Structure formats: C-alpha cells, structure tokens
C-alpha cells in the first residue's frame, strides 16, 4: 500500500515542510521509512522531525 506522510523538519532557517509518498505494509512502517529518508537525506535526527498526518494514498 502507499501512504502519504506530511510533516516538517527543523533546519537552520526554521521548519521545512514536506510531503512524502512511500510504499509500506502499514502506517507504522510508512513512518519508519519517512524518518529514515528525511534523516539520511537532510542529516536530521528523529526528534527534529514532526509528523502532522499519515493517510493512505
């Protein structure tokens, strides 16, 4: 299933909003995937990533 995850992560300039569509078996795995992607691409720790909404795409 595909999930659309919306949220924001902290940068030096402030909070940067994002929307990611990920393939996952359930909502929990979708969240883990987004934390992993944002963290690796932007060098942001999980406590600086705020998830606002997760819905099935």
From Swiss-Prot:
Gene3D superfamilies: 3.10.20.10. GO terms for biological process: translation. Keywords: Ribonucleoprotein, Ribosomal protein, RNA-binding, rRNA-binding. The keyword Ribosomal protein applies. Part of the 50S ribosomal subunit. Binds 23S rRNA. Belongs to the eukaryotic ribosomal protein eL20 family. This is Large ribosomal subunit protein eL20.
